[in-house]
């Protein structure tokens, strides 16, 4: 048995649900299907369970089930379906919450499981979907016909691998690999190991995966054409960083296999400088919040650099309940009061404006080094907190050198 096979033998144990878990998922899914069918009696619709819970590609401990209401009559609005279902579940005492994607859907809470009940329209292969959810029945059919039992096990293994390295999930928080994309990769390449072998050779903007002879053009680091919709790139959410992280992890696992790629150990925090800007969590959907604070983080990153602070890395973290924070790992949190500022070459027409500007200010210079003019001038901000406060309004807290999260730790899975 090879070293890779020995590690996978142990890793398979981590992704194999117990018979009790499988029984419970099937039981809860069947019960909710019956409830929904009863609530929508007389409506031209098919009610079924799709997604990973229906294909046995879910990870142990996962508490999510997807039930779809596939509407055959396009005059029926998803909003009306949701309203009918909400009244029914109020009547039988099942707790629920209203969620939104392109249209509303319900999340039920049944015996510790979160069951999403999603209306969609019935479409034929190749037909343009009305909503993104309309593709789900076709996705289920495509994968159910192609994935063997061993491949379904390998899908679970690949999901855990991606989750452990931090790139599992297509939501804005992660910008990584969706569950559907993970299943397509195993279906396309054949096995977990074959996916990693192929990914080791992927190159951004030059990797194009299609089950057909599709010639549709996409501009993205990774392209995986949806086999049921050739105009859609299933990998559109995968960022350059997430793709590159997966390529590195694939190469290193094949070179030096370890269970750490499936169960990362705890890594100690190092004493590097870090500043954390902490905001109260707003009452909005996670995708909206993550998108907003990633944009704010990028803007603040540029501002900090303009202030003279060297940023090693940065990121956004949140518990999606009480706080969202932007963290910057920096070289220094305090800068010296003066900085060398480079001007134009003395042979450039802009030199006169540079000299006249700094003759009116308190500086050292202007002086010439080589062909350029320079001055030594006072910084506007020397403290990183002052620089941040100049950019932002109120409603946040600044914590300096109190952060101990993943951005200041050794990568725990890498071997």
UniProtKB/Swiss-Prot annotation:
Enumerate the InterPro entries for this protein. Answer: CAA_C, CCA-adding_arc, CCA_tRNA_nucleotrans_2, NT_2-5OAS_ClassI-CCAase, NT_sf, NuclTrfase_I-like_C, Polymerase_NTP_transf_dom, tRNA_NucTransf2
Q: Is RNA-binding there in the keyword field?
A: yes
Coiled-coil ranges per UniProt: none
Name of one Pfam family that matches = tRNA_NucTransf2
Q: What is its EC number?
A: 2.7.7.72
Give TM regions.
none
Which cofactor does this sequence's record say it needs?
Answer: Mg(2+)
Question: Reaction(s) catalyzed by this protein?
Answer: a tRNA precursor + 2 CTP + ATP = a tRNA with a 3' CCA end + 3 diphosphate; a tRNA with a 3' CCA end + 2 CTP + ATP = a tRNA with a 3' CCACCA end + 3 diphosphate
Where is ATP bound in this sequence? 52, 55, 139, 159, 168
> Additional info?
A single active site specifically recognizes both ATP and CTP and is responsible for their addition.
- Which NCBIfam families does this one have? cca_archaeal (TIGR03671)
Which family does the similarity line name? Belongs to the tRNA nucleotidyltransferase/poly(A) polymerase family. Archaeal CCA-adding enzyme subfamily.
In its UniProt entry, what is this protein called? Answer: CCA-adding enzyme
User: What is this protein's gene name?
Assistant: cca
